[in-house]
Structure formats: C-alpha cells, structure tokens
C-alpha cells in the first residue's frame, strides 16, 4: 500500500535514521509496519482435472468437481464428483458420472461423461448442483447418491433435442445456491440464470443488454445479502439483488497500474463490509494490471491496487480477520510452469503478509471453511500417472480403470492435482520494509477507434524503451459453427512505428482472449538531443483495413525522468511449503470408505 508522505512544508531533521536521505523517506519508514502471521499448509493428493469445490454446512464435507482432458475436440472420459473430509483432506467417495453420447457430430458413436465444473451444495434439499461447460448443462444430483452406483440426475437443463449452442444456458461456469431465497444462480456467457431450487424454473438475466457479457465468479455480501459477480469480458462488477434478481449496480473496473491498458480481465470478487471495500482480482496482460483492485464499496471508485502474481484467479476473504487469500494460476500457454502460489493479504493494510507454494502452477479455486482455514484446488497435475476407475472407454462407454486417457488414438497420461489446506495465525505487528519502485510518467495517445499507445514521456539518446497499446485489430474472424450471438475473435493487425514520420519498426499485434494488443521496443536515436521534442506514431499497416494511427510527443533529456513511489511491504520471508499427508487411495467409483487413519509427515 502506498505510504503517506511528509508535507513539503514540514521542517526536516538534520539526520534521518536508517540511511534515509529525504523527509519523505524518513516519514515513510516511521509509518511502516505490518501484520505478522504464521502460515501452515497441509496437502494430499487430489483428483485429475480438479475445478471447483463447495462446502456443506450440514454434513461438514467438501465436494470437489473433477473433469480431466476436456478439449474443444472431444469431451472428457475421466470425471467425477468427490466427497472430501476437509480436516484430513482424504477422499471418502467418488461418483460414477452419467455417460452420454459425444456431443460433437464428428465423433458420433463415441461417448463422454456428463461432467462437473462449477459446483455448490443445497443442504435444504440434500442436493448437489453442478455446471458442465462441455455440454452447456446445469444438473442436480442427490448428495447421498455418490456411493450408490452411477449418478442419476434429479433435474438437468440439458435438452438432447437441441444442439450444443441451442441449449438454454450458455457455457455455464459457477453455481451459487441461495437457500434463503430458494434460488440457484449460474453464471455464463451472455449473463446469469436464476433457477428455482424446488420447481427448477429457469430465468435468464442479461446484465448488459446490447453487448455480450460473461459473468464468471459469484460472491455473497454477508451484510446486505446481495451477490457480486465479476464480468470477464466487460471488466465490470455486478451487484445483484437475489430476491428481485435485478442488477442494482454496475461498477466498471479501471486499469490499476498501466492506464492505457484499459482491459484488465476481471476474475474474482469479494467484499469486506467493515472496511467498506470491494476486492477484484484481475489477470491483466503480461504483468500489466495484474493483481487486486481495491474499490470503495460505496462509490465504486478505485482506492488502491495490489500487484501480485502472473495470472491471479480465485480469491476468498475471511471478513472476521480481514484476510484475503488470492491464487495465482500462472501463464496458461507456456512450456515453463509459473504461478502455483496463494498470497495471504492483510486487507486493512493492502499488504501481502505471506505466500504458500502450493504447486508447480495453476491455482484454480479456493474455499473458505467455517474455522477460517482455506482449501485450495490446483490444476498442476503434479501427481503423475495415477490409476482411476472413474474413467470410461471413449469407444464403448464402459467404465474401466486406467492411468491413460485415449481419444482418437492419442494417449494422455492421467495426472492428479493436489488438495491443500491453509491455516493462518496472527503473531502481532512487526516493522516492515519501505520498498521504493520507479514510476515512469507515460505519454499516451488514442486512435479514432479507441486503440491506445503509451511510452515513456521523457527519453534519453541510445536508450531502449517499451511502447505498448491495447486494440489494433484488423477485423474479426468467426467460427462457422458458432451462432452469431457468440463473440468473434479479433485479428491482430500488422503495425508500424514511425519516429517523426520515418518507419523504424514493423511487427504484428498479439491476440489474447477476445482482444488484441502489442508490446514492442524502440531504440532512441543517438542523433536526438536533450531539449528536443519528437513525435512517435503507431499506425496500422494491414492492406485490407482502413488506416488508423495514434501519436505521442516525447521530450529528450540527458537522464530518464523517473518518479519514486514508496510502499510498505512485509519483511522478506520464505514461502510456506505444505506438509504432505500420505495418500490413502481412491475409493471405488460409486462407493465409499470410512476415514482411514493417516499420519502427517513433512514433505
């Protein structure tokens, strides 16, 4: 969190402790302290393809959805719902999911599971609600049916007479059961759906008519009872009245640290009523706007930005203790793993006070338990070549134990993820460290279609600087099998950089999710002299699209123009690594076992 600075009119002491050279640095150091915590983590082998988890307050059990090796080319033949003891992390039961015909016409005659991605518990009716992004379905099962053979739906939204893209609920993600109002809320592409938990009547709500929305996560405000949903496509947060099913407020989430990168990719949302704040995890682009946006709960204005991680995903908050837990998925499409950590953040100070190294990569979901501990699901696949019996042969649809998943002759080793539980104890307050970081003032420009460009406002001859921007698409391309209501992918444009009208660089923009952007380097000519001003222009060079451009003016100096910001951070401390509980094996699919006695040993 940025620290307060000394007034420019304050009288400065002759000397400053700790080697600080200015009144601002001395004042910042005096104000720097942080909440000290002791972090413990426990871990056990989990399931292949873990997605989300839900806690039952009635049975005190955790239910985990698992669907492995699901791709656009084929459905999954390794999937289950597991019941887990949240104290020991042992898997007590695994379900036999319903087997259906492959929904892809080119794989007619083959089979897949009706899978489970999103999940929540309805203790009032003794049911489990799950979403299936592979078949665009929401399905309800009985909790006590996990160990009674193949699961049979109590109800499903899936209509076999309709194609995938004609299903009523589009690409469902999270499910939240509001027992007080007897409704289940499901997020997905195009809005959210409200389903009566007794009659299963479905109502669609479009929070942003005229544009395609994609709410993903759902969190309940413990004070008002309203729901908060984060929109991944539109970078907005919706506050929803669960009684009237209406959006009572829409809050835009602005850029956190790179202002000309207006796209932040909203993911998780949590609130703290006592602090009057909303916390939004944002994935950003290549480290830009990657972290947690802190919004004023009353006005919706950005108060603070906490930088963290490579690709932050899910988060939960322990409001009683004002502790935020934030997972880092890491880079999704790189050979080298990244992410795999969970940050412990003091919400009062906006400071990361601890970090758990959960897995090699891919933290996907967090669940807060009543005792304040947090269960973490990763998708790293760190347990290699496991054998499971919740697997079917894609050609026959028959259950068969296997450590390999086969589709169209291609074999994929079945790797399992981990279940991790984090517990945090307060240990008082300690002096922190004042960290200084450079803030480089930027010159920014915008083209006629809203594409942006930004670079340092002051440059030095011979210096290499970064130029970046958002937008710059050369049209769109649409998949022929997708309905027109689905978003088209933008085509990255060919771009050129001009310095005072002369072309100095040509390159192609990049594609990420539904957007296009660019990051490139520019070497400042040695012929430029301090005191001069020069114009840098980025323009499209794609022959098939109308020309457009954006320009900025930069000033040349002998030295870079940098501002220094001070922030209080926790003292450097090593990551917490989980202790490992011996794996007791998977119970037979459709069956169960009693809790085994296990010992906990250090990893």
Regions found by a protein language model. Name each.
Residues 41-43, 344, 426-603:
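Extracytoplasmic/secretory-pathway segments with low complexity and glycosylation-like composition
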Residues 3-448, 462, 466, 496, ...:
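Predominantly soluble domains enriched in secretory-pathway, periplasmic, or organellar proteins
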């Amino acid at each position: 969190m940025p620290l307060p600075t000394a007034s420019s009119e304050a009288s400065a002491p002759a000397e400053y402790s700790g080697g600080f050279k200015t009144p601002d640095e001395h004042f910042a150091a005096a104000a720097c302290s942080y909440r000290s915590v002791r972090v413990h983590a426990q871990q056990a082998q989990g399931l292949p393809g873990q997605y989300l988890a839900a806690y039952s307050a009635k049975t005190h059990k955790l239910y985990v959805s698992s669907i492995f090796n699901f791709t656009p080319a084929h459905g999954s033949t390794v999937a289950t719902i597991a019941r887990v003891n949240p104290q020991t992390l042992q898997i007590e039961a695994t379900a036999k999911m319903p087997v259906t015909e492959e929904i892809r016409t080119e794989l007619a005659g083959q089979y897949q599971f009706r899978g489970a991605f999103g999940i929540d518990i309805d203790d009032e009716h003794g049911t489990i609600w799950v979403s299936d992004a592979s078949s665009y379905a929401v399905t309800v099962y009985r909790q006590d049916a996990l160990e009674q053979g193949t699961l049979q739906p109590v109800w499903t939204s899936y209509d076999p007479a309709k194609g995938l893209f004609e299903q009523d609920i589009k690409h469902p993600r999270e499910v939240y059961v509001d027992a007080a109002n007897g409704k289940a809320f499901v997020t997905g592409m195009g809005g959210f759906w409200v389903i009566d938990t007794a009659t299963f009547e479905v109502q669609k709500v479009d929070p942003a008519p005229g544009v395609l929305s994609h709410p993903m996560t759902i969190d309940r405000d413990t004070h008002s009872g309203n729901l908060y949903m984060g929109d991944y496509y539109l970078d907005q947060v919706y506050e929803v009245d669960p009684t009237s099913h209406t959006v009572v407020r829409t809050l835009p989430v602005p850029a956190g640290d790179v202002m000309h990168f207006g796209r932040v990719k909203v993911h998780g949302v949590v609130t703290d009523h006592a602090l009057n704040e909303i916390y939004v995890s944002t994935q950003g682009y290549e480290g830009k706007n990657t972290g947690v946006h802190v919004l004023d709960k009353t006005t919706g204005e950005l108060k603070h930005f906490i930088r963290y991680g490579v690709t932050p995903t899910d988060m939960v908050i322990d409001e009683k203790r004002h502790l935020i837990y934030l997972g880092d998925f890491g880079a999704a499409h790189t050979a080298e793993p990244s992410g795999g950590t969970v940050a412990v953040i003091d919400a009062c100070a906006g400071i990361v006070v601890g970090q758990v190294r959960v897995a090699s990569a891919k933290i996907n979901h967090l669940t807060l338990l009543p005792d304040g501990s947090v269960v973490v699901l990763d998708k790293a696949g760190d347990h290699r070549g496991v054998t499971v019996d919740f697997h079917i042969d894609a050609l026959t649809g028959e259950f068969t134990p296997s450590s390999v998943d086969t589709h169209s002759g291609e074999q994929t080793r079945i790797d399992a993820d981990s279940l991790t539980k984090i517990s945090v104890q307060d240990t008082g307050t300690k002096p922190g460290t004042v960290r200084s970081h450079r803030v480089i003032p930027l010159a920014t420009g915008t083209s006629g279609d809203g594409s942006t460009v930004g670079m340092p406002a002051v440059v030095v001859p011979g210096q290499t600087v970064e130029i970046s921007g958002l937008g710059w698409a050369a049209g769109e391309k649409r998949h022929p099998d997708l309905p027109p209501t689905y978003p088209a992918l933008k085509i990255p444009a060919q771009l050129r950089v001009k310095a005072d009208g002369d072309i100095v660089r040509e390159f192609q923009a990049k594609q990420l999710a539904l957007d296009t952007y660019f990051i490139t380097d520019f070497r400042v000519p040695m012929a430029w002299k301090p005191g001069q001003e020069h114009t840098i222009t980025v323009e499209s060079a794609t022959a098939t699209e109308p020309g457009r451009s954006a320009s900025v003016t930069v000033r040349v100096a002998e030295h870079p123009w940098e501002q220094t910001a001070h922030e209080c951070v926790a003292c450097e401390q090593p990551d917490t690594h989980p202790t490992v509980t011996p794996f007791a094996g998977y119970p037979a699919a459709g069956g169960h076992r009693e809790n085994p006695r296990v010992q906990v040993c250090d990893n």
